């Protein structure tokens, strides 16, 4: 997340989730889970619900987020559950990754960056997917009218064709647009893309 406004918006949500014990996967995470295996990066992990679901399926997960409340929760939960989920507080605008992953997940994050930063971060994530590995990316796209959580000068609504264009040459395993109603007669329009990086032989996704 790129601005104080965005961080504060989600920090309050995460603190409420900790208080209530909310840990259900959202619809985008449910779509992603069957494609995850091996070493997984959850980039913008929030409360870590997807990270723990992946770990329970045998994955080893690096979970990064800008929210101290979320990462503290993840670290405590991982210790209690003895699961391989490693939570790290990180400024994801320019976080330098130093390893490759079998799967990279970035759900609901990149739209909180300005567009040049979002595109740069996406390229960095793509570069860290191993040959034959999978990327799962979910963003808000043009047509979204609910903007309450954004800094006015620091957000990015992707064009509807942006995702598939940036994954040209990859094998697209799943691609969809989803509309959700939002307050004050507004809406959120999401694009979700799951793609396999060309290269090494791989097992088919479950």
Model-flagged regions — what are they?
Residues 99:
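Active-site charged/polar residues at nucleotide-handling catalytic sites that mediate phosphoryl
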Residues 108-109:
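Short catalytic micro-motifs in class I SAM-dependent methyltransferases
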């Amino acid at each position: 997340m790129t601005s104080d406004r965005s961080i504060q918006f989600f920090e309050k949500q995460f603190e409420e989730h900790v208080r209530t014990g909310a840990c259900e996967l959202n619809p985008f995470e449910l779509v992603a889970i069957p494609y995850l295996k091996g070493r997984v990066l959850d980039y913008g992990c929030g409360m870590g619900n997807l990270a723990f679901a992946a770990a329970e399926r045998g994955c080893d997960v690096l979970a990064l987020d800008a929210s101290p409340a979320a990462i503290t929760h993840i670290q405590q939960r991982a210790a209690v559950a003895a699961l391989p989920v490693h939570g790290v507080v990180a400024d994801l605008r320019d976080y330098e990754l130093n390893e490759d992953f079998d799967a990279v997940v970035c759900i609901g994050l990149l739209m909180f960056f300005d567009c040049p930063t979002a595109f740069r971060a996406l390229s960095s994530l793509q570069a860290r997917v191993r040959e034959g590995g999978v990327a799962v990316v979910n963003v808000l796209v043009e047509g979204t009218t609910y903007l309450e959580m954004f800094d006015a000068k620091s957000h990015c609504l992707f064009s509807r064709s942006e995702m598939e264009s940036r994954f040209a040459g990859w094998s697209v395993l799943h691609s969809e647009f989803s509309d959700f109603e939002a307050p004050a007669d507004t809406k959120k329009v999401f694009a979700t893309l799951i793609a396999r990086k060309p290269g090494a032989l791989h097992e088919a996704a479950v």
